[in-house]
Amino acid sequence: MNIMRTAMLLAFMTALFMGVGYLIGGSNGMVIALLMAGGLNFFSYWNSDKIVLNMYGARKVDQHSSPVYYKIVSDLAQRASLPQPKVYIIDSAQPNAFATGRNPQNAAVAASTGLLEQLSAEEVAGVMAHELAHIEHRDTLTMTLTATIAGAISMLGNFAFFMGGQRNSSEHSHGAGALGGLIALFVAPFAAMLVQMAISRTREYAADRRGAEICGNPLWLASALSKIAGGGHTVYNEEAEHNPATAHMFIINPLKGEGADSLFSTHPATANRIAALRRQAEEMKGAMPKSMGWSEEENFHKKNSNLDYDGLNRSAQTSIFGNQENNAVQRIKKRPSWLRYEDSKRSRS
């Protein structure tokens, strides 16, 4: 069902791209846009990992340059029966991570220096297990394709607005060209953003659940999410701000503003994600390990090695996320009932 839904959403984005092409150049513009969409998808398929990793200046590490981080990823990949992905570090103070690649055999995971410095080994494992779940579900290809098309739609929207104004002034079309340009400039990128959200939100819940199964303890990921959400949006991520079409690839929305809990965000509310993970932990009960020994390795952040499980169990009701997260919970409660139902339905799936 998810595969069919994703295929339909990608088809809609391609049709939207063609519609913008039509506003620019009529039927010829529509055909050119279709060819461009095909070319972009083909290029993204073969180069998705290189595009994003180069964009964020990621540097590759191995068992010698970053032994504990690499071992965590390697151990989790074995537990998930996945090929060993390439492992990267991004020099950014904002705690965050993402996965990329066209398939499990050509995948890569990347974590920021901020994430590795602020999280315990078990919390890093929860985050990496989430990213490996995206690789296992082949979400990385879908997310890269949607980012590419959404970015192209925004670019064409700006071009269509400029061309529409030119046609209006030169052909005296009584505003038709300018109106079409306005539609392309504002409506098309907004619609593309909604499609990105529809793809990303559902997949984040699924990756959370599967990631918790891979690492063995849902509270590791829940604790990591609370720390990332609590401090991540106070740190400016210049690359993400310049490339907002890639925001949905991160475990937490890297953009400033209302962030990951906005109604128009690519990510579900962090409080909802943590609540779902807490329910999953209750289902697993005594079967969860509290440590896998990674914290005992040299050169990792031993000061963060103990998770506050009691504090985490109160996280959805207290101020652990700061004012931003509390406001997010209030916005969720004020949403229309049908939207709250959709969120709760996804968290249970």
Swiss-Prot record:
Cofactor: Zn(2+)
EC top class, as a word: hydrolase
Annotated stretches, region: Disordered: 320-349
Subcellular location, record wording: Cell inner membrane
Principal subcellular localization: membrane
EC numbers, comma separated: 3.4.24.-
Residue ranges, compositional bias (Polar residues): 320-329
UniProt xrefs under CDD domains: M48B_HtpX_like (cd07336)
Family statement: Belongs to the peptidase M48B family.
Name this polypeptide is given: Protease HtpX homolog
Species: Bartonella quintana (strain Toulouse) (Rochalimaea quintana)
Gene that encodes the chain: htpX
